[in-house]
Amino acid sequence: SDAEVMRFCQAFMTELYRHIGPDTDVPAGDIGTGAREIGYMFGQYKKIMNEYTGVLTGKSLSYGGSLARKEATGYGLCYFTNELLREHGMSFDGMTTVISGSGNVAIYACEKAQTLGAKVVALSDSNGYIYDRDGIKLDVVKQIKEVERGRISEYAKRVPGSVYTEGCSGIWSIKCDIALPCATQNEIC
């Protein structure tokens, strides 16, 4: 329940607050942790420390969070990659791109890569990956992942010509010009 999540977050911060701070370590939300949980932890930190400081990222706007926080990591990855490509006389434009993951980083990396002209053909989750040779329809992915909180396999049921494959590692065998690992740590061995 919401109350249990709140109590857990508050208890966690009661132990964590000594080890973090705006000049020490600034934790952020991660898989399964969003603005709600960060808000609970930030509220507890404020209560304990009597400070309203930048000690956690991923807060809601009402707690001083950033407007584009949700998009920041995925967009940043693409801006950084685009600069690397530019140094070598290339860009995302026309590049076939594979992206692992389908959370915030992957979804917004996909969005920005497409905006920069890439053709993103694959995304994954912890169960498998989708391949769409015509290019991922991001509106469908956002509906499944952000609204319905569903699995990426749903995409293949809704988009004709796309394919879902169980298991995640196969995504790296898809022929592409650019591969962006956005799922979790240690995914490329």
Q: Predicted regions span which residues?
A:
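Glycine/serine-rich phosphate-binding loop and adjoining beta1-alpha1 elements at the start
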Residues: S1-D93
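Short secondary-structure junctions and interdomain/linker hinges
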Residues: E15-T24, Y45-Y52, N127-I130, V147-S162, ...
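Glycine-rich phosphate/diphosphate-binding loop of Rossmann-like nucleotide-binding domains
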Residues: T57, G65-G170
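Short catalytic-loop micro-motif centered on adjacent basic/acidic residues
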Residues: P27, V98, I178-P181
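Short, well-ordered alpha-helical microsegments
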Residues: I38, A106, E187-C189
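Glycine-/small-residue-rich active-site loops that bind phosphorylated ligands and cofactors
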Residues: T33, V105, Q185
